[in-house]
Amino acid sequence: MDYFSMMVSLLLVAFHGAPETAASGTELSTGAENPGEKPPASAPWRPRRSKRCSCSSLMDKECVYFCHLDIIWVNTPGHIVPYGLGSPSRSKRSLKDLFPTRAAYHKNRCQCTSPHDKKCWNFCQAGTELRAQETMEKGRNNLKKGKDCSKLGKKCILQKLMQGRKIRRLEAISNSIKTSFHAAQLRAQLHREQKVTHNRTH
């Protein structure tokens, strides 16, 4: 009997001390009963953050600055922290289905939300070309800075030949990237034209 009276007194103190929680509990229960109701007008409406494109890596600061508009940037020691940078919206998942060639090509740096945004496509394409160009220039600089092989012998000459082959291979890769990008552009344009004519016929 002593245990029962102690429990009742604790419950009375708990409910008497927190009337706000009881009121909010009733509000929650009415909200659960009517899920179709809109929230009150006093609740602030948050607009959706606009993203021009979605970067594959947040470490690529140039891409993050370009793609994520309407973000407050705060400088911290070490790196820049973007506030309001969320996960990409679900609507972007269908981009691979709509434009398979461009999306497959641009997966290295970023993925544009709008297929008609030429600046975005050029930015993503220029990023891959610039990276290839940087690696080629780095290889050329290393080749120029190399040792004079006249006194060092066959091993040095072989190393220089291998570096020259690497540079030529990188140049061939960058040329193939450019040609594949132009081919992908033509395929995407053809796909869009076919889609438009298909929609007009039905």
Curated annotation (Swiss-Prot):
GO CC terms: cytoplasm; extracellular space
Propeptide: 24-50, 74-202
Domain of life of the organism encoding this protein: Eukaryota
GO aspect biological process, one term: positive regulation of cell size
GO molecular function terms attached to this record: cytokine activity; endothelin A receptor binding; endothelin B receptor binding; hormone activity
Keyword Magnesium: no
Signal peptide (residue range): 1-23
Cysteines joined through disulfide linkages: 53-67, 55-63
Region (Disordered): 24-49
Subcellular location: Secreted
Keywords for this protein: Cleavage on pair of basic residues, Disulfide bond, Secreted, Signal, Vasoactive, Vasoconstrictor
Record site: Cleavage: 73-74
Family: Belongs to the endothelin/sarafotoxin family.
Summary of the function given for this chain in its UniProt record: Endothelins are endothelium-derived vasoconstrictor peptides. Probable ligand for G-protein coupled receptors EDNRA and EDNRB which activates PTK2B, BCAR1, BCAR3 and, GTPases RAP1 and RHOA cascade in glomerular mesangial cells. Also binds the DEAR/FBXW7-AS1 receptor. Promotes mesenteric arterial wall remodeling via activation of ROCK signaling and subsequent colocalization of NFATC3 with F-actin filaments. NFATC3 then translocates to the nucleus where it subsequently promotes the transcription of the smooth muscle hypertrophy and differentiation marker ACTA2.
Identification of the protein by name: Endothelin-1
Source species: Oryctolagus cuniculus (Rabbit)
Gene this protein is translated from: EDN1
